[in-house]
């Protein structure tokens, strides 16, 4: 039997060629085989001694390692016909390079002798990384942990890398670090960082005798607020008083001098602005104090009040706010401002004019100071307003005299009236508008609309509405009392009208079978409607005065019923609305409710 031979191939490290050789099959033991290979390569061949690994190549050209006796027996079974073992040196570990890196890091960790941080000693502070106590050098305090400190060597070694560390160069640092961390700066809160002064340095250099500035107090007040979605909107509302005082200041010299000496000019009374809403947010429990502050003339504020050198934040456009703030928050904020405006207007009217019985002076010049051209123009406007009031027909004359308020006598563009009841109590209308041209000492002012949600429908009426309403300031006690609105009667009218609509629908369903019955049913319905309104029996002359708004009888009756409830048909908007819903009052009220919510 021929002797078995084992072929070995050695590829050494470096540019030397690989070595191929045959060995007599030494043994079936892997340890003896490995000893024979090392003896041949490193003693007989004089090759550099190193650790080697043995493997063989299978039919798939893959390297199969031979590590123990089991691997060697598998090799003998697989390669019995052609035994070929590959020998290669193990990959050397780069120990010199690692030693060099350790030396460089040791040199970097060793601080310089002249470093001033070596002389800083933090008493009663222990390094949680190496246990150095007291801590010498820079102290690194973890912001997120309750009590975790590192020395500068441990921080350089990147211990505790997952949290934010704060460097403290001295021993007099604050105990609580969280108070000095806030969110992204908005408005005046970012002024502290933009001006570049440190809060620690500011406390050391602050003058105890000096009074803090106005902006600093506002910064502290705003710093207590949490940053949220409406932070930018709240800051805009707090800046509104500073912007409105400069805008209303040029209009004050136009007032009469006598009014300035005797009484203070009520700047906030003619129009309810967002300034009142901002004041009500700041002091909602002190409404009377706000009214007494308004009695002080505002012309002295720019002179006596010191202004800071910091520029005020400009008023943000509402279009930009609508892109930042969600629509539901925006609508809720506008509704809150409207409620505050209405509340403040009622408080001002009742406290200034209702209790004392003396109305506030007008902000517009009187008829004595007007030029002849302006007097002629005002007289023309008053004549046009009186003509406009008399030109609009009324659906129920007796209801206008007893139950319907006087605001319904004129054509109103709003659905439920734009002048509330509280304002009508303190601002009675002049019962004699034709005598306004003769009484030159009578002052005039605009009527306020405290409900900004309603929109004008008729442009012609909006031009006539610019006329001023005369106020009787000479004899306020003789003002007529406002008639009380009878909601019970209006509800009864609505109920009767709904019954009438049901009867009309039932009658129209039977028109194909009994036309004669339909005519009698409509006739009886008309008689019931005439009796339900509660008016006196119509005379032949009175029938001509009743206006016809629509050719359809049911729609025309619906229009008269809604006008009796206080709605206006100016511009035929009520006719178009009831025509679109086939005279159904319930559907018309639903449509108006949806349109009001959208506005």
Swiss-Prot record:
It is found in: Nucleus; Cytoplasm. GO terms for molecular function: DNA binding; K63-linked polyubiquitin modification-dependent protein binding; polyubiquitin modification-dependent protein binding; protein kinase C binding; protein-membrane adaptor activity; zinc ion binding. Residues 550-595 form the UBA domain. It holds the Pfam family ZZ. Residues 305-319, 397-417 have a biased composition (Polar residues). Changing residue 290 to D: In strain: BPL_3G. Zn(2+) 2 binds at residues 142, 145, 160, 163. Residues 375-391, 511-536 have a biased composition (Low complexity). Residues 386-413 are annotated as: 3 X 8 AA repeats of S-A-N-Q-S-X-X-P. Changing residue 356 to L: In strain: BPL_6H, BPL_7C, BPL_11F and BPL_12A. Keywords: Cytoplasm, DNA-binding, Metal-binding, Nucleus, Phosphoprotein, Repeat, Transcription, Zinc, Zinc-finger. Residues 3-88 form the PB1 domain. PROSITE patterns: PB1, UBA, ZF_ZZ_1, ZF_ZZ_2. One of its GO terms (cellular component) is amphisome. It comes from the Eukaryota. Changing residue 432 to M: In strain: FrenchFast. Residues 95-115, 184-224, 245-319, 352-453, 507-545 are annotated as: Disordered. Changing residue 32 to V: In strain: BPL_1D, BPL_2B, BPL_3E, BPL_3F, BPL_9H, BPL_10D, BPL_10G, BPL_11D, BPL_12B and BPL_13A. Changing residue 331 to R: In strain: AfricaFast, AfricaSlow, BPL_10A, BPL_10C, BPL_10D, BPL_10E, BPL_10G, BPL_10H, BPL_11B, BPL_11C, BPL_11D, BPL_11E, BPL_11F, BPL_11G, BPL_11H, BPL_12A, BPL_12B, BPL_12C, BPL_12F, BPL_13A, BPL_13B, BPL_13C, BPL_13D, BPL_13F, BPL_1A, BPL_1B, BPL_1C, BPL_1D, BPL_1E, BPL_1F, BPL_1G, BPL_1H, BPL_2A, BPL_2B, BPL_2C, BPL_2D, BPL_2E, BPL_2F, BPL_2G, BPL_2H, BPL_3A, BPL_3B, BPL_3C, BPL_3D, BPL_3E, BPL_3F, BPL_3G, BPL_3H, BPL_4A, BPL_4B, BPL_4C, BPL_4E, BPL_4G, BPL_5A, BPL_5B, BPL_5D, BPL_5E, BPL_5F, BPL_5G, BPL_5H, BPL_6A, BPL_6B, BPL_6D, BPL_6E, BPL_6F, BPL_6H, BPL_7A, BPL_7B, BPL_7C, BPL_7E, BPL_7F, BPL_7G, BPL_7H, BPL_8A, BPL_8B, BPL_8C, BPL_8D, BPL_8E, BPL_8F, BPL_8G, BPL_8H, BPL_9A, BPL_9B, BPL_9C, BPL_9D, BPL_9F, BPL_9H, Florida1Slow, Florida2Slow, FloridaFast, FrenchFast, FrenchSlow, JapanFast, JapanSlow, Paris and WashingtonFast. Changing residue 79 to R: In strain: BPL_1B, BPL_9F and BPL_13D. This is Protein ref(2)P. The gene is ref(2)P.
